[in-house]
Amino acid sequence: MQQRSRVLGGTLAGIVAAAAATVAPWPSQATPPGQKTVTATLFERKYVDVAKACTDQLGPAGYGYVEVSPASEHIQGGQWWTSYQPVSYKIAGRLGDRDAFASMVSACHAAGVKVIADAVVNHMAAGSGRHHAQYTKYNYPGFYQDQTFHGCRKSISDYTNRDDVQTCELVDLADLGTGSDYVRTTIAGYLGLRSLGVDGFRIDAAKHISATDLAAVKGKMKDPGFWVQEVIYGAGEAVRPDEYTGIGDVDEFRYGTHLKSAFQSGNIAQLKSVADGKLWQRQARTFVDNWDTERNGSTLTYKDGAAYTLANVFMLASPYGSPNVYSGYEWTDKDAAAGGSTGWTDDAAKREITGMVGFRNAVGSAELTNWWDNGGRPLAFARSDKGFVALNNGDAALTQTFATSLPAGTYCDVVHAASSCDGDTVTVGDTEAQVDAAKSVALHVGATGQSACRQAVALHVPGQSAGSPRSSAKRVEQ
């Protein structure tokens, strides 16, 4: 074991007043419903493995939701995107059958985690299904025939033309005529996965279905549950994300792009305006990356290491949007499906992330206050008197003083001690602070005490006397 100095907190607010940047607090959002608003997306995980993850990891960490990849029967192939090319609405994809899906939902519910199913309802594909039945384009026995598809039988070519985007074909896939009552009823029937206990849906490619048609589908469901829709913003495009906010939440792709710009530019101070120009906070689902963006280069990915982790810490600490933590698998071939039982990134289960899920649950709707930055790589802020976080995206340790707004007491640093406070504690009091390079510190009122902890270091609470112990804060590295 090696010992090294590491101070975790901050002190006298007046010392940093001249350098501090302030910003009006962001209001907090309230969706998805319930007190636990964080989703974990387990991309391409078999349903039996999702069930285990809910029981062993997601439930204990405090996740409110798990999002799973599409369940419907799809074309054969060794590429991940075959899951997004359905040939029927049978629960018969590579991730598990109907029984496996139902068992997963039950296990996740028992662990306190609700289930969001990724639903592909914009189009159908052609080819052999998972059970070797052959499907031809525009002919899906028991579901759809030629007349149930849009008449534009060509690929989308003009995103400034609404009709082209919503009636022509996404990568040559047969585009469902969602203006038809029959099609709407059939889609609503598939979304009857609610009968298996599913709590909500991510609507894939929602941008390519008119908001009017999607609202009509939802209106056919007695209890549609929570919806989040994939509507990617594009400058100058005809279809906008805000058209869909009356139906449900919308994935805010600009958020992940903003995070990448901030963490790679050397100026994470720009994140004080992360909500500007985006969807209203109560309607946006935020994420650092997903399976598309990690492959097209528009966001950070697991390959970015510490910056990726810090971006997730920031997302979970800040009040804008409903956060979605993505867990995929390691890849070199952008098209390749998951290889088996190894290679999963498991970001949703990492200590830094699970600790911040608890932070998010503890601070609730508390406002963002006491924003501090120096115009460069570090930042810090409080969530009223409920929580405090500091991030250092630099390559050298940061020594600084911060205003935490926390009540006096001893707190667990939850990014280093996500459970049972078995890493570091921080005592709110009076000493200077250091945050290591490429690291963060997070404290909240739901994680206090010194159970199994080795160290204490002080931070200052504005307006309180500085009488807490001083410490060199040496931490044993495990």
From Swiss-Prot:
The active site is at D204 (nucleophile), E230 (proton donor). InterPro entries: A-amylase/branching_C, A-amylase_C, Alpha_amylase, Glyco_hydro_13_cat_dom, Glyco_hydro_b, Glycoside_hydrolase_SF. GO terms for biological process: carbohydrate metabolic process. Its cofactor is Ca(2+). Binds 1 Ca(2+) ion per subunit. It comes from the Bacteria. The keyword Signal applies. Ca(2+) binds at N122, D175, H208. It catalyses: Endohydrolysis of (1->4)-alpha-D-glucosidic linkages in polysaccharides containing three or more (1->4)-alpha-linked D-glucose units. SUPFAM superfamilies: (Trans)glycosidases, Glycosyl hydrolase domain. Residues 1-30 form the signal peptide. Keywords: Calcium, Carbohydrate metabolism, Glycosidase, Hydrolase, Metal-binding, Signal. Gene3D superfamilies: Glycosidases (3.20.20.80), Golgi alpha-mannosidase II (2.60.40.1180). Pfam families: Alpha-amylase, Alpha-amylase_C. Its EC number is 3.2.1.1. One of its GO terms (molecular function) is alpha-amylase activity. The record marks D292 as: Transition state stabilizer. The keyword Signal applies. Belongs to the glycosyl hydrolase 13 family. Monomer. This is Alpha-amylase.
